[in-house]
Amino acid sequence: MDKNFEGKQFTGVIKFTPPLYKQRYEFVQDLVRKYEPKKVADLGCADCTLLWMLKFCSCIEVLAGLDICETVMKEKMHRLTPLPADYLEPSERSLIVTLHQGSVAHKDPCMLGFDLVTCIELIEHLQESELEKFPEVVFGFMAPNMVVISTPNSEFNTLLPGVTVFRHPDHKFEWDRAQFQSWAQDTAERYEYSVEFTGVGSPPTGMEDVGFCTQIGVFVKKYPQTREPVQREKPTEAAYKTVFKAVYPSLKDEKYLQNAVVSEVMFRAQLIKRSLLDHLLSECEEYNDDPTERKLKLQCSVNCFSEDVETLAVEKSTEPFVSGNVIYIPLRKIFSVPKVNQLCGTFEKFCRLITGKVTLNSDSSALMLDTENEEN
């Protein structure tokens, strides 16, 4: 039994594993992992499943979907909204997801500047007049570095039970491999792209001559743009309606970066505090477990370690110390923590982010924590 095929051809039952739609989406995912585009647009995005899968690709910073049917997009677009976990642990990358309602036969400046444009099972739904305009909109106006177009291979239809004309009632046409490749090569030549052909949904053994169930053309621009198209190429008015936009929390936004830094600083400070107090307590005379005696024990440690505090502060020691009921943790000590260092980059930025968010000593060289609530 073939890897992508389950069932016997003679029974008239064909089942692809994974399902054919997943194979198409996984094909796009593999391209994204290989070429790492930052801006990706899916034309004919329908229920947004491909966009939902792509939002987990760490290289992508901008995702856009376009479909003629607003209702279909709205059914599942909630999956594109940030989750609580995205706010608790913001990503290092920025991510903006936008959905537009409109036709691929119309130009809109919101679709300029994309690295990759996908058209998965789209073109067979276009009217003849729309198909005529499609190449100019996608390859001429949008002009991304890469375009992926998939469409049914009509030669495979003889293996699909119940298919007499087209696979879907909304299909306006279905091409065989020669027809698709002729159209794709003409389009590629006209707009200075190269094109390679492949597909997903392998045929059963002995029927290889029909080709893949879904045929795919991968177009690559021969001379990638290094800057945005000039202003004169843009239409004066927007043609699409924006129906959804989500801006994901990112550490590139200083608000989220500050929250992450302060949270990590306080977590590390509490660990240092606990370690220091445990060390001081271990050096003192052993007492019973009576709470009062334990407090005396802590005070003994504090008093023993509080000598020459001012000298330590002036020298800006890199080690924490105790004065009275306060623990001083030098900021240099906290900044040396790898995660804090990675988040902030520089000590100056670190100090700026935590100022006003944590309690610092008079010369802002150390973070201050109270020992009073440590032993009750």
From Swiss-Prot:
Q: Which InterPro entries match?
A: Hen1 (IPR026610), SAM-dependent_MTases_sf (IPR029063)
Annotated residues that bind S-adenosyl-L-methionine are located at T49, D67, S103
Question: What keywords are annotated for this sequence in UniProt?
Answer: Cytoplasm, Magnesium, Metal-binding, Methyltransferase, RNA-binding, RNA-mediated gene silencing, S-adenosyl-L-methionine, Transferase
Q: How is the cofactor bound?
A: Binds 1 Mg(2+) ion per subunit.
Residues holding Mg(2+):
E121, E124, H125, H171
GO CC annotation: cytoplasm; nucleus; P granule
Q: Name one GO biological process term.
A: siRNA processing
Q: Needs which cofactor?
A: Mg(2+)
Write down the chemical reaction(s) this protein catalyses.
small RNA 3'-end nucleotide + S-adenosyl-L-methionine = small RNA 3'-end 2'-O-methylnucleotide + S-adenosyl-L-homocysteine + H(+)
GO MF term (any one): small RNA 2'-O-methyltransferase activity
Localization terms from the record: Cytoplasm
> Which stretches are annotated as coiled coil?
none
Write the Enzyme Commission number(s) for this entry.
2.1.1.386
Is the Chaperone keyword given for this protein?
no
Q: What broad class of enzyme is this?
A: transferase
* Database matches in SUPFAM superfamilies: S-adenosyl-L-methionine-dependent methyltransferases
Indicate the family of this protein: Belongs to the methyltransferase superfamily. HEN1 family.
Q: What does this protein do?
A: Methyltransferase that adds a 2'-O-methyl group at the 3'-end of piRNAs, a class of 24 to 30 nucleotide RNAs that are generated by a Dicer-independent mechanism and are primarily derived from transposons and other repeated sequence elements. This probably protects the 3'-end of piRNAs from uridylation activity and subsequent degradation. Stabilization of piRNAs is essential for gametogenesis.
Protein name (record): Small RNA 2'-O-methyltransferase
Q: What gene name is given for the protein in this entry?
A: HENMT1
